[in-house]
């Protein structure tokens, strides 16, 4: 059968839920009276089976999920997408579909050391990709720790690597080539994980045929094969009896397993250098309801190491994470702890208040900000949350970042009605024309005329009080015949930002069928211009609001 299609990779999560992946076979069932139907991605369920959630949608069969030491979720797929980042839980979109994961690999290629490989698609790239374990112990070089991810490529007879690096609010993955590769055509790594000893353990399926399709026929393979019950073609070369397990040892590694016999030992193990033992200690404390650890756990959350993260989630699992401890974690110097403290917030009013009070919605660390935005999107829908998201969307740093923007859109960020909010600084140079240049025109302003330049067209600084709205000067453009003329100044506009342009206009005997006197952004034409003032009019304020979609000047 196609093992990529079904559920796999079950593991204990930072949040005390069980995580796993599933392929195209999907899950279509009911849990605690609620129906679910999902496939090809990452899901989680409570250990007691009372709830299940689909979190990250990938684009094909999924057979790999892994966590870095901050609890961020990554995964791999079978076909040409070896590393995904789960930037947002799919739950923030409600019943709608939105981006919850993205392939971050710089290249899906892999690098065999033999030409004798068998692939049916995605040639010379990961197809049948498996696993996504990080180097999360001292059993690896320091510059690999929490960065290097291992993805198996059995159709290339290799175990590959990617270097996972932070990028804006998310991550990128740089192809780091092969960690293990073989010329043995049966060598087929299908999973690699960091073991209890801190070393990398690798399972070799040791099989000549990896992929289930296509089915051979006489014209292509010399014989007509038949498909079995799992839709894979029947072949005597499929081996069901042999396999090998390798352990790859870093020579400078000397970490020892912790003692877990009593509560103090379990609390100490939350700070062990191997993520395996940190999660194991957390699970044992929660499953065995070790409430005698609560005081020590609260003390540990005030630290900034990895132990603080697991202490936080242990308290959460014991229903002992009080507001004081939680609020302190939200402002801890450790960005990784702040991220997890945000994830641990519930969606009720007290926790929503903590979210707003923490200032994490404006956190300098964009990855922290993403989790804060994600939590905002998870709160019950309200006008206040939508207004907050709309305000946050006006910040270019948020609007330009794909994950931050997606989270705010999921919250309901809308075009901001700027009336009633404090506006930013005036970006126009010499906006009141108070400074006059050597050419007797407003400094930093230039004439632009598209009509024929007749002698009757005149641009000047007006100083007579009856023709000045405020200050000492105004700009006067006059002519006896029709013209298309203006003065302009250069202003840099940022992408994803909303702008307001306003001013005061007075006209005398402005006739004709043209647009009249107005303000506008030439490059945006009708999308950014005020209404025109015609005929004879006393001072009237004109204003327009517009959204700029790309950087321009």
Model-derived features: positions:
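Beta-propeller blade termini and top-face loops
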Residues: 1-254, 262-267, 275, 282, ...
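Short boundary motifs at domain starts and secondary-structure transition points
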Residues: 256-260, 466-467
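Extracellular and organelle-lumenal recognition/adhesion modules and their flexible linkers in secreted
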Residues: 420-553
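Short domain-boundary/entry signatures in modular proteins, especially
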Residues: 250-255, 423-427
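Generic signature of intrinsically disordered, low-complexity, basic-rich segments
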Residues: 169, 277, 289-292, 304, ...
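Cofactor-/ligand-binding subdomain signature composed of acidic, glycine-rich
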Residues: 272
């Amino acid at each position: 059968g196609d093992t990529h299609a079904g559920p796999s990779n079950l593991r204990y999560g930072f949040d005390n839920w069980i995580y796993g992946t599933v392929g195209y076979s999907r899950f279509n069932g009911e849990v605690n009276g609620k129906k679910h139907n999902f496939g090809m991605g990452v899901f989680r369920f409570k250990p007691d089976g009372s709830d299940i959630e689909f979190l990250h949608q990938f684009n094909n069969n999924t057979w790999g999920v892994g966590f870095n030491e901050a609890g961020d979720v990554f995964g791999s797929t079978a076909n040409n997408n070896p590393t995904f980042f789960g930037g947002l839980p799919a739950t923030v979109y409600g019943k709608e579909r939105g981006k919850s994961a993205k392939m971050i690999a710089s290249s899906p290629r892999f690098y065999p050391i033999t030409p004798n490989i068998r692939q049916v698609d995605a040639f010379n790239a990961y197809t049948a990709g498996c696993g996504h374990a990080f180097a999360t112990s001292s059993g690896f070089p320091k510059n690999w720790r929490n960065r290097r991810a291992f993805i198996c490529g059995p159709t290339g007879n290799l175990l590959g690597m990617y270097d996972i690096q932070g990028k804006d609010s998310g991550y990128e993955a740089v192809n780091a080539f092969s960690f293990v590769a073989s010329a043995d055509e049966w060598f087929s790594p299908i999973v690699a994980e960091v073991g209890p000893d801190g070393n990398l353990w690798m399972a070799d399926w040791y099989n000549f045929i990896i992929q289930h399709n296509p089915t051979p026929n006489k014209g292509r393979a010399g014989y007509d094969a038949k498909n079995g019950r799992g839709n894979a073609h029947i072949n005597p070369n499929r081996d069901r009896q042999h396999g090998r397990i390798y352990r790859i040892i870093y020579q400078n590694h000397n970490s020892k397993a912790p003692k877990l016999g009593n509560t103090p030992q379990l609390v100490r193990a939350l700070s062990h250098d191997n993520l395996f033992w940190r999660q194991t200690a957390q699970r044992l404390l929660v499953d065995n309801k070790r409430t005698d650890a609560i005081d020590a756990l609260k003390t540990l959350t005030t630290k900034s190491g990895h132990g603080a993260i697991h202490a936080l989630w242990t308290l959460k699992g014991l229903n002992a994470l009080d507001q004081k401890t939680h609020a302190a974690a939200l402002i801890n110097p450790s960005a990784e702890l702040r991220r997890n403290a945000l994830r641990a917030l519930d969606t009720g009013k007290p926790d929503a208040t903590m979210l707003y009070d923490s200032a994490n919605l404006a956190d300098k660390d964009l990855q922290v900000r993403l989790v804060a935005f994600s939590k905002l999107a998870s709160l019950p829908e309200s006008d206040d949350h939508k207004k907050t998201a709309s305000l946050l969307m006006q910040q270019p740093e948020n609007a330009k970042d794909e994950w931050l923007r997606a989270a705010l859109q999921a919250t309901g960020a809308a075009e901001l009605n700027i009336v009633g909010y404090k506006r930013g600084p005036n970006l126009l140079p010499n906006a009141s024309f108070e400074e006059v240049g050597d050419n007797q025109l407003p400094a930093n302003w230039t004439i632009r005329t598209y009509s024929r330049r007749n002698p009757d067209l005149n641009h000047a600084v007006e100083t007579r009080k009856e023709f000045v709205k405020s200050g000492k000067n105004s700009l006067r453009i006059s002519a006896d015949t029709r013209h298309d003329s203006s003065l302009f100044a250069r202003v840099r506009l940022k992408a994803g930002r909303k702008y307001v342009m306003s001013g005061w206009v007075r006209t005398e005997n402005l006739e004709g069928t043209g647009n009249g006197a107005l303000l506008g952004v030439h490059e945006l034409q009708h999308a950014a211009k005020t209404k025109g003032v015609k005929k004879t009019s006393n001072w009237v304020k004109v204003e327009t609001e517009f959204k700029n979609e790309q950087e321009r000047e």
